[in-house]
């Protein structure tokens, strides 16, 4: 998956930074090929360390670990720079997937009943957007290129909300299109390239709001609140957590700031916590079944 062209591009980036010892960080989907990349970079004179911690995005840099191990740079593959401040140079390498959306679109465009569409995807499929847009326009659609979105960031696409009838997300995984659907009033269509199906997520927005209201109502009668603060550099919001803690205490609740890297139910064993307030990644709220606790977002606390 890291062919000679990609290895050459990465080598050039590392040489421009004059890096010798580097830590490589990849998302889970690329771990099967990271050893081959490590071997190739070692042959080019670099000393390579491979991070095996989960990688959820450019918010989740392992720069402090790299610094502690005397690395000259962190090579972060597969996610775009989010502007997260790091303690050593971070080299971002976009890993674009060689994928053609057109064959799938050919099967599903007749099922799309909207005319004005904003087309979006994730960063690894950006190279496929131009051809997809051209194909849809040839079928009579008016298409805006909304570029890349993430489950936690859809500002670029949201600016088209007033001029389109719907959004069309083409890619894999529901986290990103559901995140967009929560932020816009127009329907988000999810064309799933893995399962080859088209889904309208507007109904999920209504269900999500009902679940949110139920969580808030349940939390009102509960006493012990744990406020999750991530140590991941792009997710850490300690000031917000302390503000929430003060507000909860003023309302007569017991509130504790809980700090961690990755949050799991096992890490909370032995603690008397009724409600979790998530100031970290939005994905955590979707894991309420794993935690078996009420999980609120910061804005939900204001409605208690």
Features from the language model and the residues they span:
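Asparagine-biased alpha-helical interface segments
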Residues: 1, 73, 261-271, 286, ...
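The feature marks the mature, well-folded catalytic cores of soluble enzymes
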Residues: 2-9, 14-206, 210-211, 260
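Short glycine-rich anion-binding loops that position phosphate/pyrophosphate groups of nucleotides
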Residues: 79-82, 172-175, 232-233, 281-284, ...
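Binding-cleft/active-site segments that stabilize strongly anionic ligands or cofactors
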Residues: 80, 273-275
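Glycine/threonine-rich flexible loop motifs
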Residues: 85-86, 237, 286-291
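Redox- and metal-dependent alpha/beta enzyme cores, enriched for Fe-S-associated oxidoreductases
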Residues: 175-254, 262-270
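Peripheral docking tails and interdomain loops at the edges
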Residues: 194-198, 203-205, 279-304
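A conserved acidic, glycine/proline-rich C-terminal tail/linker
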Residues: 258-261, 277-278
């Amino acid at each position: 998956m890291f062919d000679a062209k990609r290895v050459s591009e990465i080598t050039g980036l590392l040489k421009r930074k004059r890096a010798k010892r580097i830590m490589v960080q990849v998302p889970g989907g690329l771990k099967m090929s990271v050893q081959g990349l490590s071997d190739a970079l070692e042959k080019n004179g670099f000393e390579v360390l491979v991070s095996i911690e989960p990688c959820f995005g450019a918010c989740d840099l392992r720069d402090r670990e790299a610094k502690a191990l005397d690395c000259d740079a962190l090579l972060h593959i597969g996610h775009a720079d989010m502007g997260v401040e790091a303690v050593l140079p971070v080299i971002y390498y976009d890993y674009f997937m060689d994928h053609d959306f057109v064959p799938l679109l050919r099967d599903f465009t007749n099922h799309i009943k909207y005319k004005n569409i904003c087309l979006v995807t994730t960063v690894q499929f950006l190279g496929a957007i131009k051809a997809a847009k051209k194909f849809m326009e040839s079928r009579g659609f008016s298409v805006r290129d909304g570029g890349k979105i993430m489950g936690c960031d859809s500002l670029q696409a949201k600016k088209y909300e007033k001029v389109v009838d719907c959004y069309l997300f083409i890619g894999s995984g529901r986290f990103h299109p559901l995140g967009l659907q929560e932020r816009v009033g127009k329907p988000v269509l999810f064309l799933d390239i893995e399962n080859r199906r088209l889904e309208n997520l507007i109904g999920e927005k209504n269900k999500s709001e009902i679940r949110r209201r139920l969580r808030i109502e349940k939390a009102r009668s509960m006493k012990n609140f744990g406020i999750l603060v991530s140590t991941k550099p792009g997710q850490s919001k300690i000031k917000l957590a302390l503000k929430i803690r003060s507000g909860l205490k003023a309302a007569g609740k017991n509130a504790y700031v809980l700090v961690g890297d990755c949050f799991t139910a096992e890490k909370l064993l032995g603690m008397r916590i009724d409600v979790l307030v998530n100031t970290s990644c939005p994905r955590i709220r979707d894991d309420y079944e794993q935690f078996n606790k009420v999980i609120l977002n910061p804005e939900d606390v204001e409605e208690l």
